[in-house]
Amino acid sequence: MKVTLPDFRRAGVLVVGDVMLDRYWYGPTSRISPEAPVPIVKVDAIEERPGGAANVAMNIAALGCHSRLVGLTGIDDAARALGARLSEVDVTCDFVAVATHPTVTKLRVLSRNQQLIRLDFEQGFDDVDAAPMIERIQLALPKTGALVLSDYAKGALARVREMITLARAAGVPVLVDPKGTDFDRYRGATLLTPNLSEFEAVAGPCKDEETLVSRGMKLIADYQLSALLITRSEQGMTLLQPGKDPLHLPTQAQEVYDVTGAGDTVIGVLAAALAAGNSLEDSCFLANAAAGVVVGKLGTSTVSPIELENAIRGRAETGFGVMTESELKQAVAVARQRGEKVVMTNGIFDILHAGHVSYLANAQRLGDRLIVAVNSDESTKRLKGESRPVNPLAQRMTVLAALEAVDWVVPFSEDTPQRLIADVLPDVLVKGGDYQPHQIAGSKEVWDNGGDVLVLNFEDGCSTTNIINAIKRRAGQRTVV
């Protein structure tokens, strides 16, 4: 199944549901409390992340898609923290603040990556007037490519049937992450995304694939759905649609550290892809790939376009090929989160030869990821004359990207890559030839950041100029210097 990423930037998704704040307290534990037989955690780090429907909205925004979030909060520090964090990642918040209720907050205490306890602060919003929620939805629907209803049974979706009716009347697909066993309240939705246990709680235990499919199709008919996506943990996910064969997508997870928020990622990526114009099948494929990435992270997390692109290409999450500067910065950030050492070099690489290959292999051995910055055609002409480059930029970058030693290839248009190096700040900056380290463009910035600057030897007798001159001699033309 070949799927490409759509242009998420042209899409908009409205998320409505139960927003919450996930708080994490981290610290070591080395002794038992004298007051009770419980461990003492010395808290040395605190983290706050949007959860529930807010995590769905973050996953959508992380792809570059316009994300608007409607939900209920209290008037408290948790609501302010939630709004501030969401604003940082370009989620448009349209909250209804309720003075009589606290913002739903879940506090987790962790030590050595193990969760010791979770404390929930919540009252439920079932008794709150939902009219302001409906008004906000009506105003947002005309600019929305898809509506996500994220149900955590906290009361924000008390009038969910009305929300579905409004969206369908506006021609907007409705995707629901359900909660509980009353699926009738989601009647008429475009798609439901229950996990296997949620599905079986409604449809009954499924001993085999045939039973799962038949009961899923019955559920679609009973509740007038357009489709059903059952997420099945290590068994992947299954898409059911009337009149079509079931589509089973095997899991793509390589390592599973934490499944917290994985369902939010699935429905968020699925909605963003649909809103951007992908088919439902292709959107499910992308959502499945995103789930495989996010479960490899700790806590509620998002997936970037770079990670998703790499996941669907079946390569390592942070490494492949030709990139723009903004994509490179994202990829480097992901690599650093994994503790990887980033090496960077630059050059024209006009006619790739054995000396280049040997040099790049040696550079790659200095770290975990190798960036090659390549002079643009205009930059090359200024440095080498009007007869260069022999090969245009796109071809030079394609050849470099095919080398096993190279992770990322990025162009630059200036005479030197100093600005780009200062922006990326690699752990190791490498240049080949007879330079002194202080002469290398970007060396000061790398040193100031605590990095290393190294000079590697080129292989004797190998140069692009020598190759060009040899070709010209054989053709009887004037050689170049």
From Swiss-Prot:
Catalytic residues in the record: D264
Residue ranges of the region described as Ribokinase: 1-318
Annotated stretches, region: Cytidylyltransferase: 344-481
Reactions that this protein is recorded to catalyse: D-glycero-beta-D-manno-heptose 7-phosphate + ATP = D-glycero-beta-D-manno-heptose 1,7-bisphosphate + ADP + H(+); D-glycero-beta-D-manno-heptose 1-phosphate + ATP + H(+) = ADP-D-glycero-beta-D-manno-heptose + diphosphate
Gene Ontology terms describing biological process: ADP-L-glycero-beta-D-manno-heptose biosynthetic process
Example of a GO MF term: heptose 7-phosphate kinase activity
Protein residues bound to ATP: N195, L196, S197, E198
Entries under Pfam families matching the protein: CTP_transf_like, PfkB
Pathway(s) per entry: Nucleotide-sugar biosynthesis; ADP-L-glycero-beta-D-manno-heptose biosynthesis; ADP-L-glycero-beta-D-manno-heptose from D-glycero-beta-D-manno-heptose 7-phosphate: step 1/4; Nucleotide-sugar biosynthesis; ADP-L-glycero-beta-D-manno-heptose biosynthesis; ADP-L-glycero-beta-D-manno-heptose from D-glycero-beta-D-manno-heptose 7-phosphate: step 3/4
Keyword line: ATP-binding, Carbohydrate metabolism, Kinase, Multifunctional enzyme, Nucleotide-binding, Nucleotidyltransferase, Transferase
EC numbers for this chain: 2.7.1.167, 2.7.7.70
InterPro entries the UniProt entry points to: Bifunc_HldE, Carboh/pur_kinase_PfkB_CS, Cyt_trans-like, PfkB_dom, RfaE_dom_I, RfaE_dom_II, Ribokinase-like, Rossmann-like_a/b/a_fold
Enzyme class: transferase
One cellular component term from this protein's GO annotations in UniProt: cytosol
Family: In the N-terminal section; belongs to the carbohydrate kinase PfkB family. In the C-terminal section; belongs to the cytidylyltransferase family.
Reported function: Catalyzes the ADP transfer from ATP to D-glycero-beta-D-manno-heptose 1-phosphate, yielding ADP-D-glycero-beta-D-manno-heptose.
Known partners and oligomeric status: Homodimer.
Name the record gives this protein: Bifunctional protein HldE
Organism of origin: Sodalis glossinidius (strain morsitans)
